[in-house]
């Protein structure tokens, strides 16, 4: 998620940047291995040779994150295949970069002294998790993070699982876990397979067909919006939403203007000189954004979409500050950690 736009919001809305310093973000794929096989995985589905290599020397990682801190990075987005499988790399980042978010499937608990926010992905209820991901890991993830203030559970909605939202919300409620929503966004590979132009076997395309299509077709985005609002009214202490953002991200038309290659020209998550995406072998990714396998036409994941929303804040003068507060609630440091960061910022100024 491009910090150029997040940082502007931090300065203008709520004063977070004033208290803890400038937010400068970058994305790091710290792992190229995973213990699940999610249908249409945004990391592996259609990936190139870059996912086949990884830097395994922890001293190299430690020096790398030190150099990133010296470059001015203050907020790390840690992802890849499954970052919790490389806890030493998480720690190496945490020792140098003060804030961050880890995107994980929750099957391996991240140690409690790592004070980054932890976003745990869910793809459906107990019954369907194995279909979507190759294993039913919901309960394990929820037990790992029960009552953990760092954790935010993220249900990826698709055209097939909207009726499962109440089950997931109830399970999160029972485990003291907040729930937010993302929208399934097909990779270029997924779209090619659904159109019949790619046929080779893939661990990340197992059950999808014309009768089992996870993509949001006509009117399905409106159904997703209504399902989110209905669930939020039923589980107000568990579900966290920004109504303005939900209304925007579920609008029927594409969120983006595309160039002749099908690449979004008005995406708030494009890589820049400062906002960089590194692969697991520590090479600098030269693609369009931190999720280059996604088809820009249908791109609606929550983190990337929030960056784009902030980049268009002049188009939403009455709403963007509330959306920024939503970002801060789910991505920003916890109140007790924010105070420590504020004290640290004062000591270095």
Place the predicted regions along the sequence by residue:
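Short glycine/proline-enriched coil/turn segments at helix->beta-strand junctions
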Residues: 70-74, 94-100, 108-117, 146-151, ...
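Processing junctions and N-termini across compartments
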Residues: 28, 32-35, 261, 290-293
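Radical SAM enzyme [4Fe-4S]-AdoMet core and its adjacent flexible, acidic
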Residues: 121, 127-261, 265-266, 278-281
